[in-house]
Swiss-Prot record:
Presence of keyword Hydrolase: yes
InterPro entries: dGTPase, dGTPase-like, dNTPase_2, HD/PDEase_dom, HD_domain, PHydrolase_assoc_dom
Residue intervals of the HD domain: 62-255
Domain of life of the source: Bacteria
Coiled-coil intervals: none
Gene3D superfamilies in alphabetical order: Hypothetical protein af1432 (1.10.3210.10)
Lineage start: Bacteria, Pseudomonadati, Pseudomonadota, Gammaproteobacteria, Vibrionales
Family per record: Belongs to the dGTPase family. Type 2 subfamily.
Name the record gives this protein: Deoxyguanosinetriphosphate triphosphohydrolase-like protein 1
Source organism of this protein record: Vibrio cholerae serotype O1 (strain ATCC 39315 / El Tor Inaba N16961)
Gene Ontology MF, one: dGTPase activity
Keywords: Hydrolase
PROSITE patterns documented for this protein: HD (PS51831)
Gene Ontology biological process: dGTP catabolic process
Amino acid sequence: MQVSLNPEWLARNNDEHKIRRNDHRSPFQRDRARILHSAAFRRLQAKTQVHGTSLNDFHRTRLTHSLEAAQIGTGIVAQIKLKQPEFRELLPSDSLIDSLCLAHDIGHPPYGHGGEIALNYMMRDHGGFEGNAQTFRIVTSLEPYTEHHGMNLSRRTLLGLLKYPALLSATRAAIPPPAVAHQRQLKAKDWSPAKGIYDCDLASLDWVLEPLCESDRELLGQMRAEPSSPKEHRKTRFKSLDCSIMELADDIAYGVHDLEDAIVLGMVTRAQWQEAAAAQLAECGDPWFEEHIAELSEMLFSGKHYVRKDAIGGIVNALLTSISVKPVEAPFHNELLAFNAYIEPHMGNALEVLKHFVSQYVIQIPQVQRFEYKGQQLIMDLFEALSADPERLLPQATGEKWRKAQEQDEGMRVICDYIAAMTDAYAQRLHQQLFSAQSHY
């Protein structure tokens, strides 16, 4: 397959003139370095992947999750190159897929889903909040690598980060839930955010999509079937090839590695695994799982670290090697959109079983939900205080940004950006400083 990609996909929004001696790196190697060395990436080490699980240091953080997703992502690309050599020229380089997987979570706020719900509610009249939208905003404008363009990443890298390539105003439910009388009454399910890009970041989105023909741009922003109720959010249909690989790597890291955490930390029992996962995997339609599930179950709950690790590695490998590139069922002209990576349907069923098991027995349990609820309340408290008197309470540099943004009536977005960037511990510390009688700074 002959591929001749437009050199515009290597372009950066700000044409840089860096003083770099003998710099022979590719654009994507430079992108990877910028992400790795960014403050936003470092903060992931203090944002927990699953909250309230343990006080020990075994459990995963957002940072270790991102590193594992990156390793799986490069593994997916390597095996597709072997299996489908005709796509070699189109597939992302290791540096590019690494960049996407490392950056995919940097927009996540403190306290995970609880923090996301809180910020979305507090920003309900100011454009909303959503983790993926915040990731795009960080890399295109907030991270101080350049003055106005964030990390100033390559255009293809930014395209790969667009999991939901539409504005939030296009995906948000037509009828929002009513505001609550008091924040303690807020129900998380009512304020789960729509997926997309902030309307205030339209210029950055337009720049990323500039090389596409008009029909490709329109098609990329197309929605799935209309929701059954005007109270439901709309969902985008399409994404780039690079993004589809990153998303599969993220799903595998979540479904398999978070399962490992849950087993080691004693959050799930063998009986729960047998009933809610193993039984379904034995009937998922994939011959590998059907043949090996009994042995895998023994290994996962053997109590021996190296045996469990071998089982985890086997599951990751089985999922990873069942991924291939196929044409997208839509008439895209650009090759980056015309093809996506897909997992074989039966293996896809197995991955859904694993993800559902993690959600049911790890994420949705009261122990974790109480922690997220606490974080949700804490973030709303912070937002309420900072937005009530920003000039008094915001740090000096953030206060300057707020004053400038307020001229365009966008001060709330600056406060939201400030809170979203916090680590769990920093948010808790600031809350104590503002609200605890015992706090001495």
